[in-house]
Amino acid sequence: MAYIDFISVIHNSTTRDYLARVNNPDYPKAKAAKLAKQWGYDYWDGNRAINYGGYKYMEGRWEKVAREMVKHYKLPKNPKILDVGCGKAFLLYEMKLLLPQLRISGFDISKHGLANAREEIRDSLFIHRAQEPYPYKDDEFDLVISLGCFHNLRIFELQTALAEVERVGRQGYVMLESYRNEQEQFNLQCWALTCESFFDEEEWCWVYEHFGYTGDYEFIYFE
């Protein structure tokens, strides 16, 4: 299990006003969280107070991440990749552009997210919950990735999710929200609307070890 940095550059390119989000008079945090957890239009493309405020495909934004992943994991000639909690699956799309022979699969609980994925890969995506057994055989994928999904699960749901990533993938990569100090913990608690598992780095590493996950991991922080 190794820490590897793929996503933080993209994450840190966005400016966030933590107090403005938590003190928004039109969308108090409880109201915003309730809307966000419907995983529909509001979550992806609605008001910024609810989540992304417009999650659009931007050419090249995910290309560098895709290139670095392809290079790092030394994928075989006809690789298979699964994205757990893929959302609009822009990273899968960029990886497919780099490797036309790549066989991709992705699932999410958001109908809106999947419906707004790139048309070229939409047939490879489907509705499924990350905390339920995956419909695949052991070691079916050369790489299983999950970005910003598992912190939305409760602790007992993480056991199944991490075990399934370990089971169906020869290699794994999981990115989650975390914190290293009191300020980052406060910022995360202000910002996060769908997070169920608020753990620091050491706690997440304990969870990985306790539930038998041996793949790579990354944390994003709210500085």
Question: Where are each of the predicted segments found?
Answer:
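Hydrophobic adenine-recognition pocket in adenosine-nucleotide-binding enzymes
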Residues: 149
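A conserved beta-strand element that flanks and buttresses the S-adenosyl-L-methionine
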Residues: 145
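Class I (Rossmann-like) S-adenosyl-L-methionine-dependent methyltransferase catalytic domain
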Residues: 1-73, 77-137, 153-167, 171-223
